[in-house]
């Protein structure tokens, strides 16, 4: 399962969701601007200091932002099921 942490009015967050939608990936979107608990969850999960959104995980694997997400999908052939092609 893909988890996208983002916030309102974030262009790259919108692009990450659109990228996932176009590929019919199932994902959970968590708005860090709506809940301090969600922001704290992201800070606890990320292996780096979070300075921007989106921050994306596939399962428990930290991917990074939008550019890292698209690169990961293209390079690994990830198909949204947790498997690669």
Model-predicted segments: where are they?
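Catalytic phosphate/metal-binding cores of nucleic-acid and nucleotide-processing enzymes, i.e., regions
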Residues: 1, 9, 43, 68-74
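Local sequence-structure signature of Cys/Sec-based thiol-disulfide redox active-site neighborhoods
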Residues: 1-28
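Short alpha-helical
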Residues: 11, 37, 64
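Alpha-helical elements of the RecA-like P-loop NTPase motor core of helicases
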Residues: 14, 18, 40, 71
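Thiol-based oxidoreductase modules, predominantly thioredoxin-like and allied folds used
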Residues: 26-40
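Short amphipathic alpha-helix with an adjacent loop that forms part of the alpha/beta core around
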Residues: 41-46, 77
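Structural micro-motif
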Residues: 46-56, 66-67
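Non-catalytic, surface beta->alpha helical segment in thiol-disulfide oxidoreductase systems
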Residues: 58-85
């Amino acid at each position: 399962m893909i988890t996208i942490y983002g916030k309102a009015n974030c262009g790259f967050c919108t692009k990450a969701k659109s990228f996932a939608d176009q590929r019919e990936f199932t994902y959970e979107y968590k708005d860090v601007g709506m809940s301090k608990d969600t922001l704290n969850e992201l800070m606890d999960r990320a292996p780096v200091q979070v300075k921007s959104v989106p921050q994306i995980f596939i399962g428990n694997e930290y991917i990074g932002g939008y550019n890292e997400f698209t690169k990961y999908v293209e390079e690994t052939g990830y198909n949204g099921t947790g498997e690669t092609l």
